[in-house]
Amino acid sequence: MDLNIKSLAGQEAGSLGVAEGVFAADYNEALIHQVVVAYMAGARQGTKAQKTRSEVSGGGAKPWRQKGTGRARAGTIRSPIFRKGGVTFAAKPKSYKQKVNRKMYSGAVKSILSELLRLGRMTIVEELKLETPKTREFKSVIDSLGVKDVLFVVGVEEFSENLYLSSRNLKNVAVCDSVEINPVSLVCFENVVLTKKAIKEIEEKLV
C-alpha cells in the first residue's frame, strides 16, 4: 500500500510504499490494553519495604512478668500492638513484571500504528533535520504539518541532539528514534509523525 509523504512545509512530496502487515493490521483493543498494562507494570520500581516484628531493633527482654500484673501478657515490646513495634503485614519489595511474548508485543504495535493511520492521525515526512537547536524552528515545523500533541519518530541515524534540544521545551511534543517506540508512547500522543527511514526500520523490526 502507498502512503502520501509531506515536506516539512506541509506540502505533498510524493508517496511511499509500506507493508500492509504493519500498517493495515486489524485493530485489537484487548491485546493493546494487555501489552500497555504489562509495559507500565514493568516500569514500576516495587521497592516498598517495611519491617516485621522480627526485623525491628530491640525488644529482647520480656517487658513484664507473665502473671500477676493484671495486664495482658507480652513477650516483646516490638510486637505490632506497641509503639515502635513491627508492622503486622509488612510491605516487601515486589516485582510487578508481566510476561508478554514477542508476538504479542509486535502485534500490539502493528495494531496501534494501523489504527493511527486509519484515523488520519499519522503523518509521514521525507526527513526531520534541524541545523541548529532552535525551538522556534521546530515549532514552525509542527505548525506547518498542522499537528498537536505529537510524537516524532525518526531513524536511528537521524536522531540528533539538535532535535532533542529543540523539542524538549514544547508541551505535548516528543522525539524518539525507531528503536525507542513502544505501545505506551504511541497511545499517549494524539498524533504521530514518522520519517521514511523510521518506517523502513520499523518494518524491518516488525515484519
UniProtKB/Swiss-Prot annotation:
UniProt-recorded Gene Ontology molecular function terms: rRNA binding; structural constituent of ribosome
Keywords: Ribonucleoprotein, Ribosomal protein, RNA-binding, rRNA-binding
UniProt organism field: Francisella tularensis subsp. mediasiatica (strain FSC147)
PANTHER family, sorted: 50S RIBOSOMAL PROTEIN L4, LARGE RIBOSOMAL SUBUNIT PROTEIN UL4M
UniProt cross-references to HAMAP family, sorted A to Z: Ribosomal_uL4_B
Role according to the record: One of the primary rRNA binding proteins, this protein initially binds near the 5'-end of the 23S rRNA. It is important during the early stages of 50S assembly. It makes multiple contacts with different domains of the 23S rRNA in the assembled 50S subunit and ribosome.
Subunit structure: Part of the 50S ribosomal subunit.
GO cellular component annotations of the record: ribonucleoprotein complex; ribosome
Pfam hit, one: Ribosomal_L4
Identification of the protein by name: Large ribosomal subunit protein uL4
Gene (UniProt): rplD
Region Disordered, residue ranges: 48-70
Membership in a protein family: Belongs to the universal ribosomal protein uL4 family.
GO BP annotations listed: translation
